[in-house]
Swiss-Prot record:
Transmembrane segments annotated in the record for this chain: none
Keyword Phosphoprotein appears in the UniProt entry: no
Site (Cleavage): E46, G47
Organism: Enterobacteria phage T4
Protein role: The production of one phage particle requires 250 copies of PIP. During head maturation, PIP is cleaved to form the stable head constituent, internal peptide II.
A Pfam entry, by short name: GP67
Keywords: Viral release from host cell
Residue stretches in coiled coil: none
This protein's name: Prehead core component PIP
The encoding gene: 67
InterPro entries xref list: GP67
Ranges of biased composition (kind: Acidic residues): 46-64
Annotated segments matching region Disordered: 43-80
Length: 80
């Protein structure tokens, strides 16, 4: 890192670019590895079934709507 700073101070842009690329290469490789791991975690393991948490919530909501419709229709019958 000190070499990069010295190259910048001395206006040696070619050396600064090379030193910067070397410093960033290691960090870039680490970030790529981390991203590959994160992506791999998103894929299902063979034979594993996805969780249906969202579908269960939707089913409960639709049941509530059906119950509400039934109550509304009962109230309409009482009015007659």
């Amino acid at each position: 890192m000190e070499g990069l700073i010295e190259a910048i101070k001395s206006n040696d842009l070619v050396a600064a670019r090379k030193l910067f690329a070397e410093a960033m290469a290691a960090r870039t490789i680490d970030l790529i590895k981390e991203e590959k791991i994160a992506i791999a975690r998103n894929f299902l393991i063979e034979g594993e079934e996805p969780e249906d948490e969202d579908e269960d919530e939707d089913d409960e909501d639709s049941d509530d709507k059906d119950d509400k419709k039934d109550e509304d229709s009962d109230e309409d019958e009482d009015d007659e």
